[in-house]
Amino acid sequence: MDLSERGTTTARHPWEVVRAEFFRDLIARSADLGRVHDVVDVGAGDGWFAQELVPLLRDDAQVTCWDINYSADDLVADLPAGVLRTATRPSTRADLVTLLDVIEHVPDDRSFLRDEVGPLLADDARLIVSVPAHPSLYSQHDAALHHERRYTRRQFLDRLRESFTVLDSGSLFTSLLAPRAIEVAAERAGRSSGERGVGGWHGGPAVT
């Protein structure tokens, strides 16, 4: 969860749960987890996804949660074994780096990928990246989350290929496009503020 979305509830939004399951499965298929020792989760937020990764990894693996918005309290919080937090770029070269819904927050995504993310990668490392899609769905919800943009598939892949070799690509969560489109339409009609994030969710498993 993005730190800006943290609320009073500890329940996870269904979208977060499905997203975590998707990326856990993707990582299990894409990386040789028996050889993964160092993991960096860039823009890790509250670190829930990073903690969900731990059971997949070898016992001596270390997951570093990197988020520039960590407070002093965040940095001294109790964390599970093998999980660390930092507000500055880690010096380690990781075997696996996750960058999930992060680069849309960065004004200069090109330089960020090249100069900040690139140096984190060890030889033969895997980088898993996701972004919000469909620029036409950019809304007040995106603005409230400090998103600079949404991406077309081509824009996203072109940006990645400037700095990395893209081994695989795909799309996901298309089932959320219709609800998002309805929300954007309501927002433009003045019937929705679009500002509620996953941290303010209090529904059941069938309510998003």
What does each model-identified segment do?
Residues 111-126:
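A short glycine-rich, Lys/Arg-flanked "PGG" loop and its adjoining helix->strand segment in the class I
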Residues 164-174:
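Conserved S-adenosyl-L-methionine
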Residues 57, 121-123, 160:
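A generic alpha-to-beta junction signature in SAM-dependent methyltransferases
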Residues 1-96, 100, 110-115, 197-200, ...:
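Conserved N-terminal segment of class I S-adenosyl-L-methionine
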Residues 7, 127-149, 153-159:
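Short, glycine-/aromatic-enriched active-site segment of Class I SAM-dependent methyltransferases
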